[in-house]
Amino acid sequence: MCYVINPRGATEETAETAGYGENKRCYVKRTLDKNMLELNKQGYLNGHTPFSSIVAFSALIVAYLNKKKYIVLSNEASANESTIYEEEVNHQYSKSYEFEQDFNEYVKENILDGIEYFSLLRPISEYQIAKHFAKLSEFYSIFKSCNAGSKENKWCANCPKCLFVYIILSPFMNKKDMINIFGEDLLEKESL
């Protein structure tokens, strides 16, 4: 089963390509508080909400209702790294291994026993993920990871996240494929 919150084009195409037909998907609609929408108009991104923890708790309900034993996600090893110099602080705690442990303990002690929440990609780096992903050409034209362009189902090709994904994939993919994905050579873009 594939759990999907507020599906977009890339989500639907990725699930389909991965073998999760519509009958193997569970859809949930998430709405935002009006104040959050006002902040969006001011330029703030939704990434400032603890989205991964929302996913964890809502996926727990879906797993329970569908008699699933595991909730599997895709947070890589770097989700544990500190994002504040000389501090043990990550700005996305809900993507960390510590959160996985805390969540599992909380669920077991306060809600139910028998469902495990974990990240399959936890042991590997973003570099290793990029190397593996580069072998999956069927996903090239459909995957998206740009926060700014996500509402329009595209890469904006102007933000740090687009540049990061471009850089991390570039050792493993040819330039033509990279340009087909992003629309241009981001390494040649002086504004980035």
Model-predicted segments: where are they?
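Nucleotide-activated chemistry modules centered on ATP-dependent adenylation/adenylyltransferase
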Residues: 1-192
